Amino acid sequence: MPVVFVAASKLPTPFATFTMHGFLDEATGREHVVLSLGDIADGQPVLGRLHSECLTGDALFSQRCDCGSQLEAALQAIAREGRGVLLYLRQEGRGIGLLNKIRAYELQDGGADTVEANERLGFAADQRDYAMCLPMLEHLGVKSLRLMTNNPRKVKALTDMNIVVAERVPLHTGHNPHNRYYLATKAGKLGHMLGNEHQGEAPQA
């Protein structure tokens, strides 16, 4: 899958001034972004996150998920460390796209959980693919990550690509009454490591 570097620029944020790197996946036409801070090509494990696009959570302040809070917390953590990388991947709705995510939300409004809704629409519970991360990390010279995630699939995906995950850093944030059952489903059916707070609240896979 050819993923090519396009351009880089400075991106000032409330947390730090990052370098924004743009990449194009020529096979899909998707445009991905990496935000980096500090020297990330020194061979030492880099604090990082793979963050899949979530328009509703990242930009529209939705409380149906924890995505926006995780994005902000990850950027804040990288800023505190003075060094890190965030890969912003254009995989809206766990890979099903924005309009299908809205369709899934409609089913959830009727009582389905996040996994059941995807499956009723004919999709897998999680359709994301992380293969594009390898050429992006290689371009940046990153060989080892301290990965901010609760998702064991991300750890496995990177490990399978021979990217060392030196440490998994939990990212527990953004919990609220509107997403409690959603998080319980992610813990119970998708294996997300959310501690004891949501374990046992949703049916197991």
UniProtKB/Swiss-Prot annotation:
Catalytic residues as annotated in Swiss-Prot or TrEMBL: 126, 128
Binding site for GTP: 49-53, 70, 92-94, 114, 149, 154
UniProt pathway: Cofactor biosynthesis; riboflavin biosynthesis; 5-amino-6-(D-ribitylamino)uracil from GTP: step 1/4
Binding site for Zn(2+): 54, 65, 67
Pfam families per record: GTP_cyclohydro2 (PF00925)
Recorded catalytic activity of this chain's protein: GTP + 4 H2O = 2,5-diamino-6-hydroxy-4-(5-phosphoribosylamino)-pyrimidine + formate + 2 phosphate + 3 H(+)
Cofactor(s), names only, from the UniProt record: Zn(2+)
Presence of the UniProt keyword Metal-binding in the record: yes
Domain of life: Bacteria
Keyword ATP-binding appears in the UniProt entry: no
InterPro entries: GTP_cyclohydro_II, RibA, RibA-like_sf
Gene Ontology molecular function terms on file: GTP binding; GTP cyclohydrolase II activity; zinc ion binding
GO CC term, one of those recorded: cytosol
Cofactor annotation remark: Binds 1 zinc ion per subunit.
Enzyme Commission identifier(s): 3.5.4.25
GO biological process, one term: riboflavin biosynthetic process
Entry similarity comment: Belongs to the GTP cyclohydrolase II family.
Role according to the record: Catalyzes the conversion of GTP to 2,5-diamino-6-ribosylamino-4(3H)-pyrimidinone 5'-phosphate (DARP), formate and pyrophosphate.
Record protein name field: GTP cyclohydrolase-2
Species, as recorded: Pseudomonas putida (strain GB-1)
